[in-house]
A protein has these predicted regions:
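An N-terminal assembly and electron-transfer interface module characteristic of large anaerobic redox
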Residues: 119, 123-130, 348, 434-442, ...
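Glycine-rich phosphate-binding/hydrolytic loop that grips phosphoryl groups
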Residues: 127-132, 237-270, 395, 439-444, ...
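Glycine-rich phosphate-binding loop plus the immediately following alpha-helix
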Residues: 34-35, 112-153, 161, 239-243, ...
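Acidic, glycine/GT-rich loop-and beta-edge segments that sit at the periphery of enzyme/chaperone cores
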Residues: 106, 253-309, 416, 567-632
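Adenine-nucleotide phosphate-binding core of ATP-dependent small-molecule kinases
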Residues: 165-196, 479-508
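Short glycine-rich, Thr/Ser-proximal phosphate-binding strand/loop in the N-terminal lobe
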Residues: 4-44, 115-116, 120, 314-353, ...
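Glycine-rich phosphate-binding loops at beta-strand->alpha-helix junctions
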Residues: 64, 199-228, 239-243, 370-373, ...
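Conserved phosphate-binding/catalytic loops in two-lobed NTP-binding clefts
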Residues: 76-80, 226-245, 384-390, 540-559, ...
Length: 967
């Protein structure tokens, strides 16, 4: 008889095998991080259930099991080895194992030796990720599978971490997307994460076995894997227990059950962990703290029987919905704070129903709504005003502290911070796409440890040694918490430590403050997270100042919206908001349709509310609403795409030559097009990127850490092969053209050398002539000779004269292209000056004009009636200046020069586009920010990736415009 234990990140599995390796007992239980207690409990139970188990050979495996195994003297079997042993025993001939656990994901390639791919520090695409998403959708985890089977369409959702995914999903929910479609999209995201992130370019083929909880319980998830891989994998009986079975199969010695149970019970960590000072020394100090904060109080009056003027404010937030009713004096007549449960419209209706039920005769003079769900709620209930949430929170903060210098709002999954200068918002910080440091971050931890958030927060108030967890992402923090637990930290220490880490993350990761002093001394804190006294105390300790936390900290967005409605109406008139009769007749119907008005073919979610009111979501431009094509005459991004489209293929005797429309080719295509057309090739480029194109090359991406624009190259190359290209030209280019803006003119390493990655990771590239040699376009004098040497190897009939002539015309073509871009940019600027429009420099890289990379951000911004130019239009206008960093990259030198020029103009603002995974941008963003802020310009950064929902982008742009209005 053999017994195996698998101690995973979230659950413990225990099996007993008989002498013929048949499973005779199994158990599968969640341990809520109380690992030792649970092991003791399971071993005691097994002993009562199975006769003779005391003589069984015992071994232990699993990601959380090594420390326990060492301390109690049980053999530890590495889990990958255990899985392989079990697979070879029970399913001989297995080629690939895909295993998803609670927080870990693995692919085991068993053919031709063992090769293992595991997730490192990110739990994206694992069971914990699906768990989080189920919570967000407000459905039971076990219902996710059935829900996904009912899908009609899918959305693009990032699965690298739960936080990115929330950034995608929350706006979809707020816009009325069907939960079944989102559930299927979540499963597709998990597949995408596993295939692209773990396989890293190696093909998944042969006999595939699915293991682990998510793949065992969710048949639709297995179907998603099958569809993506073009195969039919098997999920064996007892797939949950393969690691435990493998451990049992490797067990070689018996144990003394009583002794092991006793040792496990008494297992304690070393007690060696870094810790901070306590939040409160004693109850008395805590009481003083509570009394001080009780002074920032909003007076409350009864709504029932109130006959004066009333103002309604609503905040449809990312995870919660808030509503308030105020009187003329700003006193609170009624308030509601509820989870949105993925349906802000229904919750807002509930709020209004309650208001009318308490006071059927209420005289609502004006109303306003803010937050992620602003647009849909405004349409649904005919609310008078919409207000961007940054301004709503600022309005509320001023009510409590008119001379406020700094406001920080920590909500469910977003952090908003504003610096105030001369009574106006001077600078805005929003968390890009990471919610460590937000309310949901704490909630996730509390739930994982088996606590309600309110109880969990209180635990940390008097902790003696709050763990120093640093300021890290949720998943990194998971490993830190586990390590601290192993080292003997108590739940109280961990609770206090997490509160401190939230604050540090907000201050040093989001705001990127070098010290708390630069934020000012007059601070208002708001957002539901600050109702947590531990977080508030940690913030005051870190800042070194006493701050103001209103007693309605969680309602400040709605309160600010109500104050805004009051100010706009001047206390006169009647609100258009749906009245009691209208609510009784209220309907909300959702249907899905394809737009079809342009190549994007956006999947639209159409919300109808009766009486002709509609809200359309999922559109990347206003065309489905206005029925007109967007005006592109003042949009440089649109102009550049049209310019590239003007280069049509010309038949050539040397065959079809394809160029991937990716990375630097968005700028260099005119050069190479003319060069090879003159050499008698039929030159064409791959289509602009789409989601489908990305997926065509996804399985060959060798690293998930590379930026999204680089990942797209694989899809472009595969598409060119499918389009019948005989030759694919994608050269390595260490240098770019010298524009005399910086100290040198390198391309970044990814742009320069990605062709090498393609050559070594795409099997199909061998089907065509692939030219990826190194070329030096920055040296016009010796380019023809070097190009001839490289190309004549592939095309021996080429002559040096042909290449010389083609090169001469190619340089002319590139110069013509640059002139057209500059001329068009100058035309846009001149027209904007004449019409008095704001000019936005949308600064990024050449490839940021790719519609799949920018997700229509240019069209969204131009919808605010501003002119858009790119950084290369204004960079030549700047005088040469010294930067604080080594200015050696062409694209980055443009950014710095553009930022410098923008500081010299009152009518220009710079918005920087940054792709996730761009290492060099860690430097450029700080430098661009410094250049702009040195002349009191607002720095706005938009991080883009596979995420397609522009809700957060819209908030950022509207906040910038609102700050400029108040300037």
């Amino acid at each position: 008889m053999k017994l195996g234990l698998d101690i995973g990140s979230t659950r413990i599995k225990c099996v007993v095998l008989d002498d013929e390796n048949k499973l005779i007992y199994s158990t599968y239980e969640r341990h809520y991080s109380r690992i030792t207690e649970k092991i003791a409990e399971i071993l005691a139970l097994v002993r009562t259930r199975i006769d003779g188990v005391e003589n069984a050979l015992v071994a232990l495996s699993g990601s959380a099991g090594m420390g326990v195994a060492e301390s109690v003297g049980v053999d530890f079997i590495q889990e990958v080895y255990a899985t392989r042993v079990a697979a070879n025993t029970f399913i001989p001939g297995t080629d690939v194992i895909i295993e998803l656990g609670g927080e870990d994901a693995k692919i085991l390639f068993l053919t031709n030796g063992l090769e293992v791919r595991m997730n490192g520090t990110c739990a994206g695409g694992t069971g914990a990720f699906i768990d989080q998403m189920a919570t967000l959708l407000n459905v039971k985890l076990e219902d996710m599978d059935e829900l996904a089977k009912q899908h009609e369409k899918t959305y693009t959702i990032a699965s690298r971490c739960g936080v990115f995914a929330k950034t995608d999903i929350q706006p979809l929910l707020n816009q009325g997307a069907r939960k079944s479609d989102i559930a299927e999209s979540i499963f597709n995201a998990v597949v995408s994460q596993t295939v692209a992130g773990l396989a890293q370019g190696r093909e998944i083929e042969g006999q595939i076995v699915y293991l682990g909880g998510p793949l065992t319980f969710m048949s639709e998830l297995r179907n998603c894997f099958d569809r993506t891989l073009g195969t039919k994998g098997i999920c064996p009986e007892n797939s949950l227990y393969y690691v435990a079975c493998g451990a049992a199969l490797c067990a070689e010695k018996t144990i003394d059950f009583d002794e092991v149970i006793e040792k496990v019970k008494n297992y304690r960590g070393s007690g060696n962990f870094a810790f901070n000072q306590p939040l409160f020394k004693n109850e008395e100090e805590y009481k003083e703290f509570c009394d001080r904060h009780a002074k920032a109080d909003v007076k409350q009056k009864e709504l029932k029987g109130y006959t004066g003027k009333a103002y309604i404010g609503m905040d449809a937030g990312s995870t919660t919905v808030k509503g308030v009713v105020l009187n003329d004096d700003g006193e609170l007549l009624y308030s509601k704070y509820l989870p949105s449960k993925g349906n802000p419209v229904e919750i807002m209706k509930q709020f209004l129903d309650e208001v009318y039920e308490i006071n059927p005769e209420i005289n609502v003079v004006s109303s306003a709504v803010t937050g992620y769900g602003e647009d849909i709620v405004k349409n649904a209930f005919a609310v008078d005003y919409g207000i961007v949430e940054t301004i709503a929170h600022f309005t509320a903060a001023k009510y409590f502290m008119p001379d406020v210098e700094f406001i920080i709002d920590i909500g469910g999954q977003d952090i908003k911070c504003f610096k105030i200068h001369n009574g106006a918002i001077d600078n805005i910080f929003l968390n890009e796409a990471c919610s460590s440091g937000c309310g949901s971050f704490l909630q996730t931890f509390a739930n994982a440890l088996g606590y309600e958030i309110a109880d969990f927060a209180k635990l940390g108030l008097f902790a003696k040694r709050p763990v120093d967890l640093g300021s890290r992402c949720t998943v990194f923090m998971n490993s830190s918490v586990k390590q601290a637990q192993k080292d003997g930290a108590t739940i109280e220490d961990i609770s206090a430590g997490l509160s401190l880490s939230v604050v540090k993350n907000a201050l040093y990761k989001v705001i990127r403050a070098s010290s708390p002093d630069e934020l000012g001394k007059r601070v208002v804190v708001q957002g539901g997270t600050f109702l947590n006294d531990a977080v508030l105390r940690a913030f005051e300790q870190e800042m070194g100042v006493e701050v103001v936390r209103p007693n309605i900290a969680g309602l400040m967005g709605a309160y600010g919206a109500a104050l805004y409605a009051k100010k706009k109406s001047k206390g006169v008139g009647k609100s258009t908001i749906t009245d009691k009769k209208g609510l009784d007749e209220f309907v909300h119907e959702i249907k899905v349709a394809n737009c079809g008005m342009c190549n994007n073919n956006c999947r639209l979610t159409i919300n109808s509310f009766g009486k002709g009111r509609k809200f359309i979501a999922g559109n990347r431009c206003e065309r489905p609403i206005t029925k007109k094509a967007p005006a592109n005459d003042m949009n440089m991004y649109a102009y550049k795409l049209n310019l590239i489209d003007s280069y049509k293929p010309v038949e050539g005797i040397r065959g079809k030559l394809g160029i991937p429309m990716a990375l630097n080719m968005y700028e260099l295509y005119p050069f190479w097009y003319r060069f090879f057309t003159e050499l008698k090739f039929e030159v064409f480029h791959s289509p602009y990127s789409t989601r489908k194109l990305y997926q065509r090359g996804q399985q060959t991406i060798p690293s998930d850490t590379v930026c999204f624009p680089a990942k797209l190259v694989h899809g472009h190359i595969q598409t060119l092969i499918d389009m019948g290209a005989e030759t694919i030209f994608y050269p390595c280019l260490s240098y770019n053209f010298d524009e005399h803006l910086g100290d040198n003119h390198y391309n970044c390493p990814v742009v320069a050398y990605y062709p090498e990655v393609i050559k070594n990771n795409m099997k199909d590239i061998r089907k065509v002539h692939f030219i990826k040699e190194y070329f030096g376009i920055h040296r016009p004098n010796d380019f023809p000779k070097k190009a001839y040497e490289r190309l004549s190897f592939h095309f021996p009939d080429l002559t040096l004269n042909e290449v010389r002539n083609a090169a001469k015309l190619a340089y002319q073509e590139q110069e013509n292209y640059r002139k057209k871009v500059i001329d068009k940019g100058n035309e846009i600027i001149a027209k904007a000056e004449k019409e008095g429009k704001k000019i936005f420099v949308l600064a990024g890289r050449p490839y940021h004009i790719d519609p799949e990379i920018n997700h229509g951000i240019d069209r969204l911004i131009s919808g605010f009636d501003v002119a858009i130019v790119s950084e290369d239009v204004v960079s030549p206008r700047a005088e040469h200046f010294r930067t604080h960093v080594l200015n050696q990259w062409t694209y980055h030198a443009r950014l710095y020069a553009a930022a410098k020029y923008v500081t010299e103009r009152k009518d220009m603002e710079l918005v920087q586009l940054v792709s996730f995974g761009c290492g060099v941008d860690a430097i450029t963003t700080d430098e661009v920010r410094e250049i702009l802020e040195s002349k009191n310009k607002i720095y706005t950064q938009i991080k883009i990736d596979e995420i397609t929902n522009l809700g957060a982008v819209k908030i950022r742009i509207r906040s910038l415009l609102a700050a400029l209005e108040n300037d």
